Each structure stands twice: as structure tokens, then as C-alpha cells.
């Protein structure tokens, strides 16, 4: 039985197979590939895109979705996550999609289930489906020619699980990862080139990925205001002028902090394309994990 906890759970060949399936799901035509299958979603952190994307993907494939309301679940009565998941597993779901603020929690639940677990984000650690849809967006834009392409990931690269997953995934496809952040948000490793402002590197980039400031993961205030942060890290029309790069953002976008209003309308900005691709990629992942499950 296969789970998706981090992007390394899939080989490069498996990822390319997922992309092949995802292309077929881009037209959003309903089908019955997963008819009779039941998928449980457990979101202990807020989500708009990821949760809705999984739900729409599942329903387009003919599966049923059961959303556990964590606000009224027995975890509020003191039940452990392990007991909660073990009880859900006893009901016979075909997959469990989970998001939690605790790093490593989805992986720790594997021994309690007989179905695939899909990590929809665990604290600062990992967000594998987001990284896969980001890569799919890049891969399709460059017609599969990703070797040697350069990306700047801009913003809170220390706390962002999206940055973490992309740091691990994109180099597998030959993409040169560069990190741009203020000192307080810098990645603590040394295997990537790091810069202080986007202006230093933007001329050399094929892709720029802007990130949301992870305010909910900070214990102290680093900037007097988000506007102060935006001076060096917001993607503005001035930065876009005369340049041809792909602009990505995992969402939600803080307008005029991460990306300006004007740039969000620019055809080089692929934020909504990422969302569309996310449904197709997650549909392909659900198909793979559920149909290949050998209990």
C-alpha cells in the first residue's frame, strides 16, 4: 500500500505517469473511475484551495467525500488523533486526506490504517500535492523541458511547507532552486543559493514563486507592517517589465504584499492556472493511490 506523505514517496517515473493522467483530467469531465469509493478528509488547519480541490477531484472521479468536522469531532473531547483515525479506518474508507499543524503527524498515522493517507499539509514540513501541481504547471509551460531552468522562491522560505516540498522536488527535474528572503525568513540549510531581495536575481529567472508570509507560524513580529516587508518582496509591474518569466503563488495571495493587483492580472501570472491544475493533479493522485491499493 502506498501513501503520499512527501514528494519522495513517488519516483520520477510515477510523477510523470501522474502528469499524463492529469492532462486527461484537465477538461473536468465527470467519470466513474472511483465509483463506490469513499474518501475522508480531516482538515485541522484552514484550507480553501486544497480541500475544495480534493473534493472536486474526488467527485469528478465518481467517489464520495466524507468531511469530518474537526470542530465537533471527538478530538475535542480528548480522543487522540491515533484513536480518531483508527476508528475512521474501521469504517472502511478508501483513502484519508489529512492536514494538521503538527509536523510528521500524517506519517505517524500510517500504522493505524488500511488505506492510503494523503498529506494535505503538516505544519512547516511538507505539502506534496501543492509541489506536484506547481511542478506540473512548470512542466507543461516548458513542454517538459525543465532541465536547467531557474526558479526563485520568494518570501518566508523557512516556515513555508510549500517551499520545503518544492526545494526537495524541483531539483529532481533539473530545476535550479534559488531562495530569496529576509534574514529572519531564510532557509537554515546551505545547499541552495540564497539572496536578500528579488531584484538581485530576477533577470536570470525562468520562474518566480511568491510565497505568503506564514504569520500563524511566527512567535514574534519581524516587520512593523506587511507593507514594510512588501518593499523588497512584492512582485510589482516594475519587476515584471521587460522580463519573461512564469509567476506562481500557492495561495492565498496577500494582494499588494506578495503580488500587486496589477500583476495578478498579467498573463505571465499563473495563479489561477495552478488552481485548475491542482484539481487535475489531485485527481490523478487519488486514482493512483486508491486503485493501486492492495490490502
UniProtKB/Swiss-Prot annotation:
GO terms for cellular component: cytosol. Catalyzes the condensation of carbamoyl phosphate and aspartate to form carbamoyl aspartate and inorganic phosphate, the committed step in the de novo pyrimidine nucleotide biosynthesis pathway. This is Aspartate carbamoyltransferase catalytic subunit. L-aspartate binds at residues 77, 161, 212. Coiled coil: none annotated. Belongs to the aspartate/ornithine carbamoyltransferase superfamily. ATCase family. One of its GO terms (biological process) is amino acid metabolic process. Signal peptide: none annotated. Keywords: Pyrimidine biosynthesis, Transferase. SUPFAM superfamilies: Aspartate/ornithine carbamoyltransferase. It comes from Aliarcobacter butzleri (strain RM4018) (Arcobacter butzleri). Carbamoyl phosphate binds at residues 49-50, 99, 127, 130, 251-252. Pfam families: OTCace (PF00185), OTCace_N (PF02729). One of its GO terms (molecular function) is aspartate carbamoyltransferase activity. Its EC number is 2.1.3.2. HAMAP family: Asp_carb_tr. It comes from the Bacteria. Pathway: Pyrimidine metabolism; UMP biosynthesis via de novo pathway; (S)-dihydroorotate from bicarbonate: step 2/3.
Amino acid at each position: 500500500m502506498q501513501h503520499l506523505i512527501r514528494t519522495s514517496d513517488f519516483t520520477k517515473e510515477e510523477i510523470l505517469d501522474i502528469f499524463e493522467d492529469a492532462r486527461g483530467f484537465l477538461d473536468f469531465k465527470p467519470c466513474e473511475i472511483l465509483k463506490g469509493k469513499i474518501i475522508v478528509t480531516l482538515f485541522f488547519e484552514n484550507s480553501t484551495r486544497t480541500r475544495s480541490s480534493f473534493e472536486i477531484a474526488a467527485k469528478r472521479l465518481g467517489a464520495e467525500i466524507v468531511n469530518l468536522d474537526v470542530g465537533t469531532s471527538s478530538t475535542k473531547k480528548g480522543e487522540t488523533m491515533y484513536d480518531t483515525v483508527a476508528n475512521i479506518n474501521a469504517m472502511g474508507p478508501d483513502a484519508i486526506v489529512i492536514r494538521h499543524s503538527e509536523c510528521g503527524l500524517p506519517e505517524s498515522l500510517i500504522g493505524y490504517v488500511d488505506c492510503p493517507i494523503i498529506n494535505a499539509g503538516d505544519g512547516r514540513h511538507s505539502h506534496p500535492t501543492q509541489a506536484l501541481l506547481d511542478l506540473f504547471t512548470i512542466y507543461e509551460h516548458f513542454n517538459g523541458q525543465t532541465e536547467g531552468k531557474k526558479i526563485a522562491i520568494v518570501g518566508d522560505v523557512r516556515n513555508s511547507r510549500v517551499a520545503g516540498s518544492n526545494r526537495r522536488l524541483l531539483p529532481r527535474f533539473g530545476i535550479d532552486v534559488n531562495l530569496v528572503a529576509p534574514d529572519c525568513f531564510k532557509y537554515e540549510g546551505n545547499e541552495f543559493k540564497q539572496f536578500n531581495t528579488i531584484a538581485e536575481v530576477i533577470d536570470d529567472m525562468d520562474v518566480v514563486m511568491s510565497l505568503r508570509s506564514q504569520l500563524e507560524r511566527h512567535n514574534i513580529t519581524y516587520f512593523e507592517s506587511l507593507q514594510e516587508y512588501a518593499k523588497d518582496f512584492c512582485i510589482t509591474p516594475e519587476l515584471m517589465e521587460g522580463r519573461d518569466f512564469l509567476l506562481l503563488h500557492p495561495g492565498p495571495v496577500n494582494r499588494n504584499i506578495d503580488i500587486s493587483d496589477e500583476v495578478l492580472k498579467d498573463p505571465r501570472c499563473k495563479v489561477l492556472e495552478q488552481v485548475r491544475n491542482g484539481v487535475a493533479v489531485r485527481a490523478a493522485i487519488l486514482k493512483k493511490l486508491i486503485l493501486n491499493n492492495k490490502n
